[in-house]
Amino acid sequence: CGGGLRRIGEDVTESLDYVPGRFKVVRHVREAFACRACEQVVQAPAPHHAVPRGRAGPGLLAHIAVAKFDDHLPLYRQAEIYARDGVDLATSTLSGWLGATAAAVMPLVDLLRRGVIAGSDVLHGDDTPVPVLAPGTGKTTTGRLWTYVRDERTHGGARPPAAVFFASPDRRGERPLAHLARFSGVLVADGYAGFNGLYAGTRPGGALTEAACWAHVRRKFFDVHAATGSTLAAEALARIGALYGIERGLHGKP
């Protein structure tokens, strides 16, 4: 009608959008000064780089590592993605940066491993197969990722939960022997024969105490019962369930 308007409220509409990651060049300018009397030159030191004489910042290095190991994105695919953004990075360059990143964080990894393995009374251990591409062959081999977990929340312990990982090209029993060389205590694990050397009296440092994993034991009875309806397997499942009930009642208590 042409009359004046007054605000009476508002409606808000939201939508989810995505802003792709962007590269940026961080430029550090370090001015140099010379003493008028003695000509001595002073200048702030160059910023630290995780990659010696490299041009990758910490954010980019972290992104490459997470994309590779957490998102399972091979370096050649990362290179293709970065090229779409106008940044050409050879896979050999990315590989070198990744190796330098691993070297830079290794002291923290070693500290975590010592704290978890040597500083724990009870550990949970397991391994999982990992396909590994064999360079130059186009084929994959089966490596192993070993995980050792400390979690004292079940019995009211004071130490925080933590996990450490080791990678190996195979599943030989010498692997857990080396991983747990500094550990002394109880190991909760499945019945894999490769762990048996840890429970042997001939183990340097003494035998570990074996605590078999009930979840793995239960799985065998569950499979038999599902396939055959065995009453014996059903009885075993019921008894294991009763043990689980006791554990739930004790959870978190010292």
Residue locations for each model-derived region?
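Charged, often Cys/His-bearing segments associated with DNA-binding zinc-finger transcription factors
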Residues: 1-32
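Catalytic center-proximal scaffold of phosphoryl-transfer enzymes
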Residues: 6, 27-34, 39-254
